[in-house]
Design a protein with these regions (language model features):
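A generic structural signal for tightly packed, nonpolar segments enriched in small/aliphatic residues
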Residues: 1-108
Length: 108
């Protein structure tokens, strides 16, 4: 399933619904405040990911949230669904193209 996170629940819900309609699974991930502290950096204003942590997708969402405070936004993280992933072949699954098409088509 593609990870979905954002600062507007209505928008996130529409994306999750588009996933259900299109048959491309999506799952909402939390952007809890405690994850924000992982972006602390001794070398820059903000780190884009914390070393050695297992919540990289969520940390990526937290990173995006720092630059989108004035906007409603949602992020569809495709890292887990985009590659064929069989270890033998190169290429992409095409996911979440169907989800995104369904979202755009149903929200015109």
């Amino acid at each position: 399933a593609a990870g979905v996170m954002g600062n507007d629940q209505r928008l996130v819900d529409k994306i999750l619904e588009a996933g259900q309609v299109s048959g491309e699974k999506a799952w909402q991930l939390p952007l809890w405040e405690e994850y924000q502290s992982y972006l602390h950096s001794n070398f820059a204003d903000i780190a884009n990911i914390a070393p050695g942590r297992a919540a990289g997708t969520i940390e990526g969402g937290c990173f995006l949230s720092r630059f989108t405070e004035d906007y409603k936004w949602a992020h569809v993280d495709i890292a887990g669904v985009a590659d064929i992933g069989d270890g033998k072949n190169k290429g992409s699954t095409g996911k979440p193209v169907g989800l995104l098409f369904e979202y755009v088509n149903s929200n015109r």
